[in-house]
Amino acid sequence: MGSERLLIRNGFVVSMDSDVGDIPNGEVLVEDGAIVEIGRSLGVSGAEEIDATGMIVMPGFIDTHRHTWQTPVRGVLPCCTLDNYFAVMLGSVGGHYRPEDVHIGNYAGALEALNGGVTTLLDWSHINNTPDHSDAAIQGLKDAGIRAIYAHGVPTGGEWWAFSELEHPEDIRRIRDTYFSSDDGLITIALAARAPGNSNFEVAKHDWELARDLAIRISVHVGMRLTDIEVQHVKNISDLGLLGDDTTYIHCTDSTDEELDLIAESGGTASIAPYVEMLMGHGPPPTGKLLERGVRPSLSVDVVSSVPGEMFTQMRTALVHDRILSHTDTPKEAFAPTLTHKDVLEFATIDGARACALEDKVGSLAPGKQADIVLLKVNAINTAPMVDPVGTIVVFADTSNVDSVFVAGRAVKRNGQLVDVELDSVFKKLDESRNHILSRGELLPEWASEPMAAV
């Protein structure tokens, strides 16, 4: 945790909490890593003060599904299909990862998230080729200082994905006992499951029962369109009697109306990744369909091998995609979209917290919650002048506006710079990791063998 008492002053508080509301020239008092008071002119003395003049004070973003391990091969597939991704990343590239590649991937990837104001990350880790790979992934998250859910998945390789007969690795029991005996830590654990259809039905039943035996949440990809594969993942889960409110369903882009009804009726949550879903052809993000059923989606980055690792892109993509779906071919019908900028900010904050079962801890600024706080500079050339604070966050801001980030009251970014991070060392390790991985997959550009000149 951070400083014992911290007072953030003079900022525009966008709390994402209906009771607290928005507070111009607001103050947030933090003690021992938690928020204890929010208001104006709190009259606090003896606390470390941070002047947030010209800034929005907001909760940290929550990314509910990111394959953080892919950071060392960022850009290897900038414009690919889902078929191509499975063939290259899971069928080839992932098999060349050493534990040290996983560590730098998770460490640098978590730093990237923090740099962009993401304070909570669900790390959907399907690079568990050995126990050492798993240990390295967890250590990378710990070293970065992010709040995370480590979602333990299977190793890479096609044998784990095409109606696989291989059960989820039992090593998850060791990991649960070794690292996550308590559910109150900054990093917790979930099971990154394969839907029935990716594994066979008996394996899926085993994996769901394994998660529930360990008393951990489940995160699963469903409804992704792959060529010549027709499968109703959610219906299969339902037919096996495995639906539950402990499960987050990722994508749902090709899920049927019946399947979306099943998610809603079971109390499940959803995570959409709109940029990659349209880039790779998963299918249209089902934002409106989920909302019609009372399921408020969360947002996720997904594959950092192909997608920007910040949430501003995801918010804007979700907003404009769903709004244009309201367009009709009838000129006499007025354009009448319903999704708003406030909705997508909720997706990226409090709805993300709900998808991770962390809504009592994070996702909004309120007394009693953890001090996961972002200071967003709005006295900047791309955001000034401010009229609508939520609009400023969603429509105009980007990572360059993220001035300061706190996780449980501890500063991980201040004055636009990550705290206690040797970036030159990080970049060097990323280059070395990229070269090792991609050279073995015959994907390394010729120029990459030479060090890039310092900028």
Q: At which residue positions do the language-model features occur?
A:
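Active-site gating loops and adjacent loop-to-helix segments of metal-dependent hydrolytic enzymes
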Residues: 72-102, 157-169, 226-246, 266-269, ...
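Divalent metal-coordination and catalytic microenvironments
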Residues: 11, 28, 33, 54, ...
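Alpha-helical scaffold segments that flank or form the walls of functional sites
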Residues: 74-146, 170-182, 431-436
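Metal-coordinating catalytic core of metallo-dependent amide/deamination hydrolases
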Residues: 132-260
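His/Asp/Glu-enriched, well-ordered alpha-helical/loop segment
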Residues: 240-242, 246, 287-380, 396-398
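A conserved active-site cap/scaffold subdomain adjacent to cofactor or substrate pockets
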Residues: 258, 264-302
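Active-site microenvironment of metallo-dependent hydrolases
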Residues: 1-26, 30-34, 343-455
